């Protein structure tokens, strides 16, 4: 057999897949299941998106794009996100990826050495904790507190978690995972 890297012992799983198995078993017994656990809610793709995809394929736009993403898309995302957040975002600050997991891992590899701490939101994306520990770091969770307007970070509590060994704080918009404002 092949010897595998010891760090694989630290690689966690995404709990949503365990929930998916339990949901499938529940559904197999005839129960109604609303599959929100994987973010795959089977909503049909909007017709204008299908049309744009078909036009792009017909125009031969099927090869590689620039590493950080198509410039026009980055510009549109910067404008839209900036408008929603009430801030100015440059297209150079926007990177389009094929998914969240690879970029989270690359970010942590860039800013964290083994033994360092990273603060991450809980509830949040389970991959944060898994990848921090996989890469040899210490995952330190922080939470959001309910307020009259929704939820907010308890800044004093967050500051109390910061140590000289803290290398990063991951911020996660509460729209994902709990659709809160």
List PLM regions with ranges.
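N-terminal small-domain helix-loop-helix segment of the aminotransferase-like
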Residues: 5-99, 106
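CheY-like receiver
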Residues: 22, 107, 157-161
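Short acidic capping loops at alpha-helix termini that bridge into adjacent secondary structure
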Residues: 88-94, 114-117, 165
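A short helix-loop-beta submotif of the ANL/AMP-binding
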Residues: 134-140
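Active-site phosphate-binding strand-loop segment of PLP-dependent enzymes
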Residues: 140, 145-181
């Amino acid at each position: 057999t092949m010897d595998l890297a010891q760090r694989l012992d630290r690689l966690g799983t995404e709990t949503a897949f365990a929930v998916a198995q339990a949901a499938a078993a529940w559904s197999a017994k005839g129960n109604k299941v609303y599959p929100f656990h994987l973010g795959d809610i089977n909503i049909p793709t909007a017709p204008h998106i299908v049309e744009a995809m078909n036009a792009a394929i017909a125009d031969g736009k099927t090869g590689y794009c620039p590493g950080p993403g198509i410039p026009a898309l980055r510009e549109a995302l910067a404008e839209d996100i900036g408008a929603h957040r009430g801030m100015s975002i440059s297209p150079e600050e926007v990177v389009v990826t094929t998914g969240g997991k690879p970029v989270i891992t690359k970010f942590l590899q860039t800013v964290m050495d083994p033994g360092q701490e990273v603060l991450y939101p809980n509830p949040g994306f389970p991959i944060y904790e898994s990848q921090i520990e996989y890469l040899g770091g210490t995952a330190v969770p922080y939470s959001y507190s309910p307020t009259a307007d929704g939820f907010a970070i308890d800044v004093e509590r967050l500051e109390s978690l910061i140590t000289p060994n803290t290398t990063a704080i991951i911020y996660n918009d509460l729209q994902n995972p709990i659709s809160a404002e």
